[in-house]
Swiss-Prot record:
NAD(+) 1 binds at G7, A8, G9, E10, V11, E29, T70, G71, R101. The lineage of its organism: Archaea, Methanobacteriati, Methanobacteriota, Stenosarchaea group, Methanomicrobia. GO terms for molecular function: potassium ion transmembrane transporter activity. This is Trk system potassium uptake protein TrkA homolog 2. Part of a potassium transport system. NAD(+) 2 binds at residues 232-262. One of its GO terms (cellular component) is plasma membrane.
Length: 448
């Protein structure tokens, strides 16, 4: 398959990086620094304006997907519109799916939508995608990440093992998991471990668990984290991300939501649109204000202003003053590990949320769902096994799997199975695989 990515900034670079694992990718960019960085990838680089008709016409033949993710909404929309006009003038060319990154709430009010009538098959809003991701994390109090697969039959959750967790120092075989759950991977510092029974659990490990949703709901007890129950939530910053997230939380009858916003006019505007939340005009770094609002009693503090440094400071203050769990927005991808290194429970990125959404929409043949983990170091991928797949019809022990990839779950009809070496995958089975990013291309070949 062939893909065009317009814009090689934070978002475009990472989309091109991942698409290049399964697609032939062309990157269009006019910034010299971004061009040099994109040139490090296994992609073709074209210098120029991605909305230019001549440039688009030169790359469009045989393109399956065009993704416009520059930092300017109008450029992204015009690029998609122009591509569709060019395709109409060349009916023999392959039909191209167009995807545009759009942030302005005047254009989009949901994370993902379609504007096919103007030439944009899919619009994605990074800020709203991020808000949805945070809301998903809030619905699973002890988890730092969560995704559904196989139409809701399989769930992935990632847990951070705190130093005081009762599992620290124990072996994997000592974890009492139900038969329908499996620990797929452990992230430890910069290492990724495919665990075995005699592996020890260490403080600050991140553990990826896959299983049936019913069993996953009980994992809070297994992992021993004192998970908050979404009751008392303080949201700092009510821009696009904050407001969309506030709307989601505001509908939860069990949530007691307070919002801190420094712009008085925005406070008045938001107060008229939220029914249950308490809106406070102030600065999220004001220690006196935080103390007045009893931050030590907060179950969750979420800092989602448009400024990474302010989010970091707000989060550190909240943590120091006793908040149970802190979530912070980090627009710069290199800040995410830094935030977590200094004690922020969860760092979330609009860029990563957007990459996840684009990858879901550009998945290759046979791929039903996909989620990136730990800053895109690994992926959980759901495939449907076709009759031609190399993985079908023989025991798993006889299949040469690439290093860094394992089959975690198989859904056969309505049965969810943790496969062993003698298990045989059949045509039509849904196969959930954990794979390091370096192993994804090799895994793809097994399903062709």
């Amino acid at each position: 398959m062939k893909a065009v990515v317009i814009g090689a900034g934070e978002v475009g670079y990472h989309i091109a990086k991942f698409l290049s694992l399964t697609h032939d990718v062309i990157v269009i960019e006019n910034d010299e620094d971004a061009l040099r960085r994109a040139d490090e990838l296994d992609v073709q680089v074209v210098e120029g304006n991605g909305a230019n008709a001549d440039i688009l016409a030169s790359v469009l033949p045989d393109v399956d997907i065009l993704v416009a993710v520059t930092g300017v909404d109008e450029v992204n929309i015009v690029a998609c519109m122009t591509a569709k006009l060019i395709l109409r003038a060349h009916p023999g060319w392959k039909e191209t799916k167009t995807i545009a990154r759009v942030s302005n709430p005047d254009y989009i009010d949901v994370p993902v939508t379609s504007r096919a009538q103007v030439g944009v098959d899919i619009m994605i809003c990074p800020e709203l995608a991020l808000a949805s991701e945070v809301a998903e994390v809030l619905s699973n109090p002890s988890a730092i990440d969560a995704e559904m697969f196989a139409g809701g039959k399989v769930q992935m959750m990632e847990f951070a093992i705190r130093p005081d967790n009762r599992l620290v120092g124990k072996r994997m075989q000592d974890i009492e998991l139900e038969d329908c759950c499996i620990v797929s991977a452990i992230f430890r510092n910069n290492d990724i471990i495919i665990p075995h029974g005699d592996d020890f659990i260490k403080a600050n490990d991140h553990m990826v668990v896959v299983g049936k949703p019913r069993a996953m709901a009980d994992l809070e007890n297994v992992f021993g984290n004192e998970g908050p129950h979404r009751n008392r939530i303080l949201l700092i910053g009510c821009g696009i991300v904050g407001f969309y997230l506030a709307k989601i939380i505001d509908k939860d009858e069990n949530a007691d939501l307070k919002v801190i916003e420094y712009r008085k006019s925005r406070c008045i505007e938001v107060a008229e649109m939220l029914e249950n939340a308490l809106i406070l005009n102030g600065d999220g770094t004001d220690v006196n204000l935080l103390r007045e609002e009893n931050i030590e009693d907060m179950d969750v503090v979420i800092a989602v202003t448009d400024n990474d440094e302010k989010n970091l400071l707000c989060s550190l203050l909240a943590k120091q003053m006793g908040a149970k769990k802190v979530i912070a927005r980090a627009d710069r991808s290199d800040y995410v590990p830094l935030f977590e290194m200094v004690g922020i429970d969860i760092a979330v990125s609009p860029r990563e949320a957007t990459v996840n959404e684009v990858l879901k929409l550009t998945m290759g043949k046979g791929i039903e769902a996909l989620a990136t983990i730990e800053g895109e170091k690994a992926e959980i991928i759901e495939y449907t096994a076709s009759g031609q797949s190399k993985i079908v019809g023989k025991p798993l022990s006889k299949i040469k799997f690439p290093k860094g990839a394992i089959v975690t779950m198989v859904v056969h009809d309505d049965d969810v199975i943790i496969p062993r070496g003698e298990f045989i995958i059949r045509e039509g089975d849904r196969v959930i695989i954990f794979a390091l990013s370096s192993a994804v291309r090799s895994v793809e070949k097994l399903f062709k």
